[in-house]
Amino acid sequence: MIFQIGIENNNEGYRSITWALEHPGCFSYGSNAETALTALPVAISDYADWIGLHEPSWVLGDQVELHVADTWTDYYIDKHFDRLPGSDYYLVDAWFQYDWKPLTGIDIERGDKLLAWSRADLLGVVQRLSATKLDQAYPGERWTINGILKHVSNAERWYMDRIGYPVNTNKNDVLENSFMRLEAIRKHFLDVLPRLEGLQKTIGVDGEFWSPRKVLRRALWHERDHTEHIRKLIGR
């Protein structure tokens, strides 16, 4: 099976991500493009198996042919949209040629399923944790687990705002309880998703390009990434 790949370098200033562009939620990391690309076949196999837990997988992960379609290097800009080195400024993340493509009906149908499975995985990891564990601080970590959950929902809210579908409340007003916040913002996301089918919409916001396809790609990556993040914290 042929996979169209996007390579994103300098992600968060220190790593590379390889994205299976036709399969949101499928990605791998590395210290550079080469190591990230080397890790991708295993990530594709795991992704196919993950889908297969729920229904016959539409991804064939045993015969993988990678075609690098696009490469991007993240960079920082200031409020004047000038590129500057250093992490004190806004980091512009990857915009691939593939992100221009409007979402199809199949993309929407599969995206809805992937979002449901990803959310079930996240909740399966955290739902039985005590309040103490949810609010436990971890050395070297920016957030508690509760903080990560709020970050996941706030990011999803932010993604939708990028393409002109904001949640109609202030971020701090969207339910203090992290589980209720996750549910409320995801409901908005799922309500909007069918309206994005076939929509030829690309918006530049704060120096970065966004489209419905990029939003779906980023939302699934972000939740799956932080689900693994939380698993690692619990295992400490």
Per-range role (PLM):
Residues 1-3, 10, 77, 87-89, ...:
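Generic detector of short, locally flexible boundary/turn motifs and exposed helical patches
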Residues 3-33, 37-56, 60-67, 75-78, ...:
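Short, contiguous alpha-helical
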Residues 13-20, 86-98, 198-199:
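Short alpha-helical hairpin
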Residues 43, 71-72, 85-86, 185, ...:
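A general marker of short, structured functional hotspots
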Residues 65-102:
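A contiguous, low-structure linker/loop signature
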Residues 87-105, 112-135, 154-163:
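A short mid-domain helix/strand-loop element embedded in enzyme catalytic domains
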Residues 101-128, 174-203, 210, 214-222:
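Acidic/histidine-rich alpha-helical segments that form the ligand environment
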